[in-house]
Amino acid sequence: MYDYAFVHLKFTVPAAVLLTAIAYPILNRIHLIQTGFLVVVAFTAALPWDAYLIKHKVWSYPPEAIVGPRLLGIPFEELFFFVIQTYITALVYILFNKPVLHALHLNNQQNPPAWMRVVKVTGQVVLVALSVWGWNAAQVHQETSYLGLILVWACPFLLAIWTLAGRFILSLPWYATVLPMFLPTFYLWAVDEFALHRGTWSIGSGTKLDFCLFGKLDIEEATFFLVTNMLIVGGMAAFDQYLAVIYAFPTLFPKVNRYPTTHMLLQSRLINTSRYDLERIEGLREAVERLRLKSRSFYLANSLFSGRLRIDLILLYSFCRLADDLVDDAKSRREVLSWTAKLNHFLDLHYKDADATEDPKKKAERIDAYIKTAFPPCAYQALHLLPTHILPPKPLYDLIKGFEMDSQFTFHGTSDSTDLQYPIADDKDLENYAIYVAGTVGELCIALIIYHCLPDMSDTQKRELETAACRMGIALQYVNIARDIVVDARIGRVYLPTTWLKKEGLTHKMVLENPEGPEVIERMRRRLLENAFELYGGARPEMQRIPSEARGPMIGAVENYMAIGRVLRERKEGTVFVRMEGRATVPKRRRLSTLLRALYEQ
């Protein structure tokens, strides 16, 4: 009795609920629009086709297996299947595509490799051929009619999607397309086999090939679920392609609202691919790789941001990392000061040498010319793509001041080693340094978040949020210093204040020679961590005021970094993995659980 409703209650609804619970922290309005749009399209496209199948006895349902109500002869349970299948597959697609930065996969739109052209054309030819064969097979009531009806209905839609987004789909990682297609398909095959075995629905004799993939699962039913999931995944990917165009190219879409409009999506579809700035895509690829190699915590958290905010955060990190590397890789203090002077001049060209009458294109060319002459080629993209039109100047200049403080250190074993200087004399110097190198980054991140998510935020709220972000940045830097005492000593740096050392009867030289040694160093490490967690405790509640789209990922990034501090505080064998000869590390499972907890709590 009511077997079809039982199938939903036992299989499809629980799967949808579970996927919703898993995906909930990362779902945003765009995902809901994507999924809702595809549900409407799937329902509308399947309605007349399904009605035709039932009318011509291809599909049938025992009266006792359904509740009763119908639309165009289709049981309500079947109508619900259109919706629930689309929803399930869309959620699986969203989950597997969240780590993917789709903008990186627009690079094959202008000059695709030969293999991609061949695959796309081959796919088009095959889909046309299957459509024609399906049309012929569906004309007569014979064993191939059900398979023909599936193909003549689905293949034209697949052809349209493949023509519009084939190159983009081929550019995506296999796990972002193949798994969302096949995982729901395998699950629904099992559900369908169960229903066919129970007689919940049946395929009319004489309309099928009578070949089963396994058990009672007819090859036609297996084909149906495969091609419909291909349609759903293809539709989601096509949607993501046009979103990626909007987010990736500010020259084509200078201002993107919180959520792109339908008009913008249509524009992105109609824009000629020759206008795509592929140099920007390559620069973004460099930035992502720099992020992946240099910061596991932020790399993980960044994938949870969305849209142009995610891209701008990556570009900001790339600039900060590049500037830091220029300082760290320098061979002398003089070289460090040379780099900081060049970085300051780069900022001057953007912020201080602004001439309202100067043509923006000429200004950009002038800045690019300076970048190419003053910096190595590997630095070009990080500097060129920095979104200075959004970022406030003061935190950027202060960031360079932090590098200037670093320049006062000499490098162990170099010709400068006879003139040791340690700029962090007391608590105030320590705080200033942390503000310069980390508090500024917090302020810059908040500036990007406000610009992209809540540009109408009041000035008072902005200042309060920026202050909290700065304090949180200081806390994270204290954790960083506590973690890297040994690593920093190897390059001749001691960030512990001189006043702390004197109180404990230590000198900088003693720390450099034996950074893992006396217990007093461990006491100072704990003092740094106490200061860090005190600042963290004061700033953490303020982070709840971050706009909802960015709150979870931002808090997740902070919590992942503070987990390092917790590792250092625990120091219990078997509880965590700590390498004091280098850097404390947080196990991957713990990093992931910390991030998920932060997301679910929002």
Swiss-Prot record:
GO biological process terms, semicolon-separated: carotene biosynthetic process; carotenoid biosynthetic process
Effect of K208E: In JA28; Abolishes lycopene cyclase activity and accumulates a polar precursor carotenoid of neurosporaxanthin
Pathway membership: Carotenoid biosynthesis; beta-carotene biosynthesis; Carotenoid biosynthesis; phytoene biosynthesis; all-trans-phytoene from geranylgeranyl diphosphate: step 1/1
Region (Phytoene synthase): 248-602
Residue span of region Lycopene beta-cyclase: 1-241
Localization per record: Membrane
Keyword terms, alphabetized: Carotenoid biosynthesis, Isomerase, Membrane, Multifunctional enzyme, Transferase, Transmembrane, Transmembrane helix
Gene induction: By blue light.
Impact upon substituting W189R: In JA26; Abolishes lycopene cyclase activity and accumulates a polar precursor carotenoid of neurosporaxanthin
CDD domains per the UniProt record, alphabetical: Trans_IPPS_HH
A GO molecular-function annotation: squalene synthase [NAD(P)H] activity
Entry annotated with the keyword Transferase: yes
Catalysed conversion reaction: all-trans-lycopene = gamma-carotene; gamma-carotene = all-trans-beta-carotene; 2 (2E,6E,10E)-geranylgeranyl diphosphate = 15-cis-phytoene + 2 diphosphate
Keyword Lyase: no
Transmembrane segments: 6-26, 30-50, 76-96, 118-138, 146-166, 168-188, 230-250
Gene Ontology cellular component terms for the protein in this record: membrane
Pfam family for this entry, one: SQS_PSY
Membrane topology: Multi-pass membrane protein
Record EC number: 5.5.1.19, 2.5.1.32
Physiological role: Bifunctional enzyme that catalyzes the reactions from geranylgeranyl diphosphate to phytoene (phytoene synthase) and from lycopene to beta-carotene via the intermediate gamma-carotene and from 3,4-didehydrolycopene to torulene (lycopene cyclase). Torulene is further processed to the acidic carotenoid neurosporaxanthin. The cyclase preferentially catalyzes single cyclizations at only one end of the substrate to produce monocyclic carotenoids. Neurosporaxanthin is synthesized from geranyl-geranyl pyrophosphate (GGPP) through several enzymatic activities.
Family: In the N-terminal section; belongs to the lycopene beta-cyclase family.
Full protein name: Bifunctional lycopene cyclase/phytoene synthase
Taxonomic classification: Eukaryota, Fungi, Dikarya, Ascomycota, Pezizomycotina
Gene transcribed to yield this protein: al-2
